[in-house]
Each structure stands twice: as C-alpha cells, then as structure tokens.
C-alpha cells in the first residue's frame, strides 16, 4: 500500500493540477495518469492528503469542476457516527446515574410531608401514640402522656414515706391506755349532768337554724354565754353559729334552765341540730 499527496500552486493567471493515481495489481487500469485543469481564484493553495487503507484506495475524480476524495469522505463518515454514539452513551450514563437520586429525593419529600400531617393529626386529636411503617422505614410519634415511666419510680418512693408514720401511729396507741387510766376519774367527778340525760327526749331543745360552726363564747379566750344549770330568758343569746364567715347569734325561744349542752365548741353543726336542752 502507498500514500499519495497532491499540492497545487497557481500564479495569478492560471494553475494546473496534476493528479496521479496509483493502483494495485489486482485492479488494472488502462490509462494510469490523467490531467485535470480548472481555473482557481487568486493565489489559492490546496493540498489533498490521503492515508493508506487496507480496504480502499485513494481516488481522485473531476466532474463539473468538483473534486472529491473517497477515502477522506469515508473517514469523515466513520468518525462522525462513532463520536455521536459516544456522546449518546455518556448522556445515557449521566441520566441513569442522576435518575435514582431524583427518585430518592422525591420519595423522601413525600415521606416528610406525610410525617408533618401525621404530627398535626396527633396534636389535634386525643391520640397518645402513632406508629407508621413504610417500606424499610418505621416512624413512632408519642405524646408526653405515653411516657409515664420516669414518674412511676417517684410515686413508689412517695408511697413508702407515708408507711413509716403509720407504724409510728400504730405504736402510739399502747401509750394511750396509760394516759387513759386517770380518765375514769373525770366522769366520776361529774355525776350531776348524767341524771338529766334519760329525760332529754321529753325535754324541749334549742336547735340550730342554719349550718355552720358552733361557738359557746363570743370570742376566743372569753367565758361562754351560758353554762349547765343557768337560767335563761326567752330571747337571751345562748351561742354563736358561724356561717359564710358571718357570726350569727342564737337566742333561746323559751324561758327555762339549761340542762345539757349537746353541741361541742368549735365543731360544725347542720340545720336543726340540737344545741341545748332547756327545761321550762
């Protein structure tokens, strides 16, 4: 195989081109050389190069003032599609590489929107705990009410503390009987109030007209209004009943002698509770 080069140099008037073609022994040609002449513009410089190829031979043709080289056109045709195919493959690779990333970003954004809607749903409803599973992802939304575990140990500790005073209270009653021993002497020292007790049902009583707290004296530290055995007149003040932070004086509705004081000083009384037993 051999290569051929063609160079054309023309003066201002005209130029001549010599084209020599070489062929192999396999393809015999009768006329081995031809002469082609045509006019060119001022001072053109043209150079035609053809590289050796195993499958084709350089051929120069001149038809209607046009020169074409088969080898160079073939080379252009071969180079063009190969570069286009390479670009297409690269673009496919880039698109295939970027498509999964876009898919994952879209799925993540959709999942986040679902999470926000679920959080709003839990806040607006009486839902304590919500669990969501999607593909390989698991989401759990819990309120503070669903986490009572840290408070449970504190409650057990508080339950143990009241138990200790209870034992002390149980141990205290044995000392009370010793102090209760002198108590029997007090009932013995007050025999007079005991006789009228059987006749209480038949004697008239002064009842409380309202609910409140019963007080025998007008103020703390002062002597009581009446005592057992005192004679009272109708309309005389016997005690005070505090109701709604008001001190209400209770008067006797008849004249007589105070036989018994039923209510206890400083204790609450209800409506129509007997306060005194007054014998006419």
UniProtKB/Swiss-Prot annotation:
Residues annotated as domain Biotinyl-binding: 203-279
Pathway per the UniProt entry: Lipid metabolism; fatty acid biosynthesis
Spans annotated as Disordered: 52-106, 164-215
Principal location class: plastid
SUPFAM superfamilies the UniProt entry points to: Single hybrid motif
Compartment(s) of residence: Plastid, Chloroplast
Alphabetical keyword list: Biotin, Chloroplast, Fatty acid biosynthesis, Fatty acid metabolism, Lipid biosynthesis, Lipid metabolism, Plastid, Transit peptide
Superkingdom, natural source: Eukaryota
Record CDD domains: biotinyl_domain
Tissue: Present in developing tissues from roots, leaves, flowers, siliques and seeds (at protein level).
Subunit structure: Acetyl-CoA carboxylase is a heterohexamer composed of biotin carboxyl carrier protein, biotin carboxylase and 2 subunits each of ACCase subunit alpha and ACCase plastid-coded subunit beta (accD).
Record's protein name: Biotin carboxyl carrier protein of acetyl-CoA carboxylase 1, chloroplastic
Top-level taxonomy: Eukaryota, Viridiplantae, Streptophyta, Embryophyta, Tracheophyta
UniProt gene name: BCCP1
């Amino acid at each position: 195989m051999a290569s051929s080069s063609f160079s054309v140099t023309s003066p201002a008037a005209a130029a001549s081109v010599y084209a020599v073609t070489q062929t192999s022994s396999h393809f015999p040609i009768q006329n081995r050389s031809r002469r082609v002449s045509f006019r060119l513009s001022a001072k053109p410089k043209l150079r035609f190069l053809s590289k050796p190829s195993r499958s084709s031979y350089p051929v120069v043709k001149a038809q209607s003032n046009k020169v074409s080289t088969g080898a160079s056109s073939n080379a252009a045709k071969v180079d063009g599609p190969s570069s286009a195919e390479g670009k297409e493959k690269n673009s496919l690779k880039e698109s295939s590489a970027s498509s999964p990333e876009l898919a994952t970003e879209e799925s993540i954004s959709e999942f986040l929107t679902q999470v926000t809607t679920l959080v709003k749903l839990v806040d607006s409803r009486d839902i304590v705990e919500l669990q969501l599973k999607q593909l390989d992802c698991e989401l759990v939304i819990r309120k503070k009410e669903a986490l009572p575990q840290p408070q449970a140990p504190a409650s057990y500790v508080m339950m143990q503390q009241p138990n200790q005073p209870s034992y002390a209270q149980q141990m205290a009653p044995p000392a009370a009987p010793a102090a209760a021993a002198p108590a029997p002497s007090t009932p013995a020292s007050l025999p007079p109030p005991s006789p009228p007790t059987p006749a209480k049902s038949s004697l008239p009583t002064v009842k409380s007209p309202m609910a409140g707290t019963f007080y025998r004296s007008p103020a703390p530290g002062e002597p009581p209004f009446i005592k057992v055995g005192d004679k009272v007149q109708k309309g005389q003040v016997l005690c005070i009943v505090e109701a709604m932070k008001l001190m209400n004086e209770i008067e006797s509705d008849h004249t007589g002698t105070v036989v018994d004081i039923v209510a206890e000083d400083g204790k609450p009384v209800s409506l129509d509770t007997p306060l005194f037993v007054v014998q006419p």
